[in-house]
Amino acid sequence: MNATSIGVDLSKSVFQVSFANAAGRIVERKRLSRQQYERFLVQQPAAAIVMEACATAHHWAHTAREHGHDPCLLHAQYVRPYVRRNKTDAADADALLRARRDPDLKPVPIKSLDQQALQGLHRIRQQWVTTRTQRINLARGLLAEFGISLPAGAAGIVRRLHETVDGVPPPLIAALAPILDEIKAIEDHLKQLDRQLTEIAKTDPDMQRLMTIPGVGVIIATAMVASVADIHSFARARQFAAWLGLTPREHSSGQMRHLGNISKRGDGYLRIMLTHGARSALLLAHRQANKGEHTLTSLQQWVLELERRTHHNKAAIALANKMARIIRVTSTRAQDYSAR
């Protein structure tokens, strides 16, 4: 057997492996346990290892690379059309080998271990923010039934709950106490994690460069470096904005061209963070405009004029799109953003 490329359908305990020769013809198939697959990577001569970009894919990509193989991760959505007839593990492994031969199908860049760890911090932070919001909404909804209106924000709700408990039955007050403790604990965890991200950003030149862009702070800068394995893989800045789902969805045919709302494809967390950053930059532009039009940068003038012609939300999304393009340019050129 002279296999030059190997398709692997990953799972927790069983790995389906297909072997293809230089002509792309599948010459053998195997079904391996986890231990057998680990030994296989050590003993198999160097080859291209093709896998779906799914859970554990980065671990196996790093392991394959350590043993001299050339790992390749493909997006599962784009591999699916190459599955013939019924879906089985063997069919999925075969489809990976067919998809790899498509010149228009770009592989998913493999993240470094540091990028994976940094992305893990952001996933933990995201989960804490979600949990905190759920607890606050629960307390707010329950107390609203007793005529208590709570302010927005975690700090406001904790302070108000300690001040106002008149008319609330004691059993409910007792049940809300651990929820309040949980909200305060999550607040402390978030502050600690944000300090950790700040320390990481201080020592990373790429993050420092990103933070020269209006609306980009520690959270966006660290999230970008963690999530985008290789920004040079985007040939143009517009491709990067499209990858983030910040470009219009298109439905065109013949002479008719229709552009809809933004596609919202790609990394939703990055898109949300960029949108928050854009709203912050837009608010700053308004404050700057109050000091005089002559104090505005060209980017601020552009977004304020766009807001006057359209809508605040559309202007914020357009600015997020612009920020994504600036991020790609400053990163590929390795230079700070210079406001004009």
What is the role of each PLM region?
Residues M1-R340:
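A detector of single, family-specific signature residues
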